[in-house]
From Swiss-Prot:
Family statement drawn from the similarity comment of this UniProt entry: Belongs to the universal ribosomal protein uS3 family.
Any Pfam family: Ribosomal_S3_C
Domain of life according to the entry: Eukaryota
Lineage: Eukaryota, Viridiplantae, Streptophyta, Embryophyta, Tracheophyta
Biased composition (Basic and acidic residues): 120-134
InterPro entries given in the database record: KH_sf_prok-type, Ribosomal_S3_C_sf, Ribosomal_uS3_C, Ribosomal_uS3_CS, Ribosomal_uS3m_plant
Organism of origin: Zea mays (Maize)
Protein name: Small ribosomal subunit protein uS3m
PANTHER family: RIBOSOMAL PROTEIN S3, MITOCHONDRIAL (PTHR35928), SMALL RIBOSOMAL SUBUNIT PROTEIN US3M (PTHR35928:SF2)
GO biological process entries: translation
Swiss-Prot/TrEMBL keywords: Mitochondrion, Ribonucleoprotein, Ribosomal protein
């Protein structure tokens, strides 16, 4: 008899060496309860009103893995111009700017067009009121628990508000083990017990990204791959590492890929690294792509050479007079600072303190001359003061990676970093876990299988479209990105597709998608959608090349 192979969700890198009980249905109810609390919690943060845009949860995807949980927020952009609107009845939503952020497929994040049902669902005059169109689907809606028991104010603004939540929320069941059962529940209770948590500036800044320009050939690829995706689509990824027993005492990393090149932030430098490999890894990161206002390549090369010289001096003084210790990584608008842990490696020799002070001053001057912006230096000094380095320079080690590709530094960015640090420590302390908050810029939809799976589910929900047309739209531009690391894609849809009387399964494959090789890099994501004809399921598998280092965004990598 043939040996039954392990499911693909078990063979993912994130799920290996895990407890088999995670994949059982024993803890299914508790996992669903925690998912609902998470969605309720994030949707209740700064709800939109008639006067304020608020935090519009365009789409929230929760992916559970045995060792971590990904929470993907798809954030609609604020309109460029908010036109004056006359006083009218709240029922008339025509031309109103708050209707544009209606939850829908990825394309709805950038378009006000939608179905008649979506256009009829608008916000009322009150912050907590909603005017909804009544149709058959909403009349037959079954609540998870009675209305009186909704103590968390569950009013999910996401499309998955029906009885059957997407299986992508529970693909591997990280919380099915009793060991991790209460972690997400603690996060859900934060909104109820701590009013200061709601008032943080993190969500005001973080969840309302301004329009950013996307350069490079990938912008054209995005426009043609999925009609829904735009090059400036932003979403945040919040990862909770469930090290409840052995909590590591380091500040989690904040990765801002809008300004930092991919691969700059690597938490692998933390702890246990050998001296030679650590030096090699750090020296490999000494790469500068400084673009000043001038277009003269010779001047740029000279400035780059001088700056590298000072950085190498900082690297040589990094471990002077101390032993090599664990470091923490703090990216800052494209400038990456390395500081030793507080209280480790105190320099008693005044010579080293004076040398570091002189070197820090020279670095400030060089950065000011290269960037030509006083605002940059003010933010750098505030950031250094924030890290308590201004008074006591204990174990300071400094390397700078500057990625300024003619991009403006957003207003209030230093305040954003402060709020990120507060949120990080707050969640880490209250939940007894290591929290990593990231902001990821989508450059290619093929970075994540969950993006494609969710978009297909929306297309099946809104329109009775055939599987062939969906598949052809997705795979038509795959040959353009194959040199970047994508080998192939496999998509399967099951259900009464197109209103068929008998349910069937249709699959499409393009390129190489081997599911039987353990060392194959595969990103897998399922999705479930409720249609008029029943429940349909979607499975997407994307395979990446072994040689060209193509990886999925679910692993915090970038194609």
């Amino acid at each position: 008899m043939a040996r039954k192979g392990n499911p693909i969700s078990v063979r993912l890198d994130l799920n290996r060496s895990s407890d088999p009980s995670r994949f059982s249905d024993y803890y299914y109810g508790k996992s669903l309860y925690q998912d609902v609390n998470l969605r309720s919690y994030f949707s209740s943060i700064r709800p939109p009103t008639r006067l304020t845009f608020g935090f519009r949860l365009g789409r929230c995807i929760i992916l559970h893995f045995p060792k971590r949980t990904f929470i993907h927020f798809f954030l609609p952009r604020r309109p460029l111009r908010l036109k004056r609107r006359d006083k009218s009845r709240p029922g008339k939503d025509k031309g109103r700017w708050w209707a544009f952020g209606k939850v829908g497929p990825i394309g709805c994040l950038h378009s006000s067009e939608g179905t008649e049902e979506e256009r009829n669902e608008v916000r009322g005059r009150g912050a907590g009121k909603r005017v909804e169109s009544i149709d058959r689907e909403k009349q037959n809606e079954i609540r998870i628990w009675p209305k009186k028991m909704q103590r968390y104010g569950y009013h999910d603004r996401t499309p998955s508000r029906k009885k059957n939540f997407s299986k992508s929320l529970r693909v591997s069941g990280a919380f099915k083990h009793p060991k991790y059962a209460g972690v997400v529940n603690d996060i859900a209770f934060l909104i109820e017990n701590d009013d200061s948590f709601i008032k943080t500036k993190l969500f005001k800044f973080f969840f309302l990204p301004k329009k950013s320009r996307s350069d490079g050939p990938t912008s054209h690829l995005l426009k043609r791959t999925l009609p829904a995706v735009r090059p400036s689509l932003n979403y945040s990824v919040m990862q909770y590492f469930f090290n409840t027993k052995n909590k590591m005492h380091f500040d989690p990393v904040v990765v801002l890929n809008h300004f930092v090149a991919p691969g700059v932030a690597e938490p692998s430098t933390m702890g246990g690294a050998k001296g030679g490999s650590l030096d090699k890894r750090i020296r490999s990161r000494i790469a500068f792509f400084v673009e000043s206002s001038t277009s003269d390549k010779k001047c740029l090369a000279r400035a780059k050479k001088r700056l590298i010289h000072f950085i190498r001096q900082a690297n040589d003084l990094r471990f002077a007079g101390t032993t090599k210790t664990t470091i923490s990584l703090f990216p800052f608008f494209g400038a990456t600072f390395f500081f030793s842990r507080d209280g480790v490696g105190v320099y008693n020799n005044p010579f080293y303190e004076y040398a570091r002070e002189q070197l820090l001053g020279q670095l400030r001057i060089k950065c000011r001359n290269l960037m030509g912006k006083d605002k940059v230096m003010e933010l750098i000094e505030k950031f250094i003061d924030l890290g308590r380095i201004g008074k006591l320079i204990k174990g300071i080690e400094m390397m700078i990676e500057i990625i300024l590709r003619k991009r403006r530094i957003p207003y209030g960015y230093n305040s954003y970093l402060n709020e990120v640090q507060k949120m990080r420590s707050f969640l880490s302390n209250r939940t007894n876990t290591n929290t990593l908050i990231e902001s990821v810029k989508i450059k290619s939809v093929y970075q994540s299988a969950s993006l494609i799976a969710q978009d297909i589910s929306f297309q099946l929900r809104n329109n009775p479209i055939s599987f062939r047309s969906i598949f052809s739209k997705i795979v038509k531009d795959i040959p353009l990105i194959m040199p970047k690391g994508v080998e192939g894609i496999r998509i399967c849809c099951s259900g009464r597709l197109g209103g068929a009387e008998i349910a069937r399964t249709e699959c499409g494959k393009y390129g190489k998608t081997s599911c039987n090789v353990f060392n194959q890099k595969i990103d897998y994501a399922p999705a479930e959608v409720s249609t008029r004809d029943g429940i349909s399921g979607v499975k997407v598998r994307i395979s990446y090349s072994q040689n060209k280092k193509g990886r999925a965004i679910s692993e915090t990598y970038e194609i």
